[in-house]
């Protein structure tokens, strides 16, 4: 039975390996209910408590200096907020193993429940795309191209902009389950915050500037 509440989720990190000391430095989640985007999102920059390798910063554009200029909190300061936001939801993630691994590692550092213990259901859009389009490219960029989704504002791989794109991709991939247009028409306008371009349907619950 499909869950009423879904969260489109993405993270940015210092590297690839949560079990080898890499840390999360950005979290974003966009809420949907019954396949309709709501006004709610959670977007946080996070201090990783370690260096940010140049090769990682080249991907997401976040350096330690930038994070410190945003007064980014440590994960220990926001982990409970993230857990409460995700609890009981279906999580829509592209390459879910990566983000789930980092979130669970960060939660475990704090003694918090894992995503599974929070009763979250995981849906991996990468696996969905590989099944639906076998032998074809299945990256988020490739899927945006396939579904003619505008990604011109995506300069870096930011967690929030990637969530916004993934929301459109997911609704397009699963269009037979509900109306793609209705998901966007069902929400009103809200003002965008200053640090990241975003569609008007988002009201950020918490974001450190």
Task: Give the predicted meaning of each segment.
Residues 1-119, 130-133, 142-156:
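Conserved non-catalytic scaffold segment of RNase H-like nuclease domains
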Residues 199-205:
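Metal-dependent nuclease catalytic regions and adjoining charged, substrate-binding loops involved
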Residues 123-131, 188-195:
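Short, flexible loop segments at boundaries between secondary-structure elements
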Residues 90-96, 102, 106-107, 139-199:
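Acidic, Mg2+-coordinating catalytic module of metal-dependent nucleases/exonucleases
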Residues 12, 207-209:
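Charged interaction scaffolds used for protein-protein
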């Amino acid at each position: 039975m499909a869950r009423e509440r879904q969260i489109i989720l993405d993270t940015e990190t210092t590297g690839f390996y949560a079990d080898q000391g890499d840390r999360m430095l950005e979290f974003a989640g966009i809420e949907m209910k019954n396949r309709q985007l709501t006004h709610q999102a959670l977007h946080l920059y996070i201090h990783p408590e370690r260096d940010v390798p140049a090769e990682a910063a080249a991907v997401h554009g976040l350096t330690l200096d930038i994070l410190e200029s945003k007064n980014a909190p440590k994960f220990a300061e926001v982990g409970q907020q993230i857990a409460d936001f995700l609890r009981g939801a279906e999580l829509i993630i592209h390459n879910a193993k990566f983000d789930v691994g980092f979130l669970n590692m960060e939660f475990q550092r704090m003694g918090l429940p894992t995503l599974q213990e929070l009763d979250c259901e995981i849906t991996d859009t990468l696996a969905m795309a590989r099944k639906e389009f076998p032998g074809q490219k299945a990256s988020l960029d490739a899927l945006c191209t396939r579904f003619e989704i505008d990604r011109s504002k995506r300069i870096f791989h930011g967690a929030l902009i990637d969530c916004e794109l993934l929301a459109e991709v997911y609704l397009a991939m699963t269009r037979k389950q509900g109306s793609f247009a209705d998901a966007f028409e069902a929400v009103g306008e809200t003002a965008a915050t200053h640090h990241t371009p975003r569609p008007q349907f988002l009201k950020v619950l918490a974001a450190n500037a």
